[in-house]
Amino acid sequence: MSAIFNFQSLLTVILLLICTCAYIRSLAPSILDRNKTGLLGIFWKCARIGERKSPYVAICCIVMAFSILFIQ
C-alpha cells in the first residue's frame, strides 16, 4: 500500500524527511540554505522544523519506532 493512503506510513515518511533534512543541514548547510523558496524550499522548511522542534521530533520518532516494531 502506498504511503499516501496509509496514515501511519505517511507520518513515517514525514518524520524521516524531517530528520534527514536536519541531518544534511547540520553537515552541509549551504546545500539547503540556497533554496529557501519554491519546490526545493520544502527541504529547507523540514530542516528548520527538525532543528527548532527537535525534542518533539525525537519523541515522535521514538513513538513511531515503538509502534512499528511492537504493534504492527
Curated annotation (Swiss-Prot):
Residues 27-53 are extracellular. Keywords: Glycoprotein, Golgi apparatus, Membrane, Signal, Transmembrane, Transmembrane helix. It is a single-pass type I membrane protein. The chain crosses the membrane at residues 54-71. Glycans are attached at residue 35. One of its GO terms (cellular component) is Golgi membrane. It is found in: Golgi apparatus membrane. Residues 72 are cytoplasmic. Pfam families: DUF1242. One of its GO terms (biological process) is constitutive secretory pathway. Residues 1-26 form the signal peptide. Belongs to the KISH family. Involved in the early part of the secretory pathway. This is Protein kish-A. It comes from Mus musculus (Mouse). The lineage of its organism: Eukaryota, Metazoa, Chordata, Craniata, Vertebrata. The gene is Tmem167a.
